Amino acid sequence: SRGSEMCIRDRCISLLKVMLTNYCIYDCAYCVNRRSNDLPRATFSVSELVELTMEFYRRNYIEGLFLSSGVVRNPDYTMERLVRVAKDLRQVYRFNGYIHLKSIPGASRELVNEAGLYADRLSVNVEIPKEENLKLLAPEKDHKSVFAPMKYIQQGVLESKEERQKFRHAPR
């Protein structure tokens, strides 16, 4: 993993761009971390990654975290670990930096929604938009599981917007 930058408007911030693990249960032909690829594998524990992020943040090496992961055990197990990293950073360490989480295709709506409570940004990789191509290159994945997290994120954004509208007109 190496640091990177993200720029919004005229401001760029340095990010720790890291994967929780490069192990993966899937064997997607397009992915370097596919199960059949013979490469060194590594996994952070939740606490290791939280401590590493905080150490870099305290030393002003980074201003935020960009976190992704290979899929270990199943999508919910992996997503739950990503959420725990963000939650621990926010609630235990009072981390005020930027957090961008990659949502795991196939993860439950509840976990994607919980991720949205702690992350500044959620995104989903959609490598293959057509179902027939997905079956060719990633036969263990299905189209619905790839697109579901985007739907969950969109619904969460709309619900949040509705809540803000309600409170904007509340009596003071």
Regions found by a protein language model. Give the residues of each.
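Ferredoxin-type iron-sulfur electron-transfer modules and their immediate structural context
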Residues: 1-2, 13
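Conserved, mostly hydrophobic/aromatic
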Residues: 15, 28, 67, 124
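Short, small-residue-biased leader/transition segments that mark boundaries at the very start
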Residues: 3-8
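Canonical Radical SAM [4Fe-4S] cluster-binding loop centered on the CxxxCxxC motif
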Residues: 18-47
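Conserved AdoMet/S-adenosylmethionine-binding subsite of the radical SAM
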Residues: 50, 73-172
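Short acidic, glycine/Ser/Thr-rich loop/turn "cap" segments at secondary-structure junctions
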Residues: 33-39, 65-75, 99
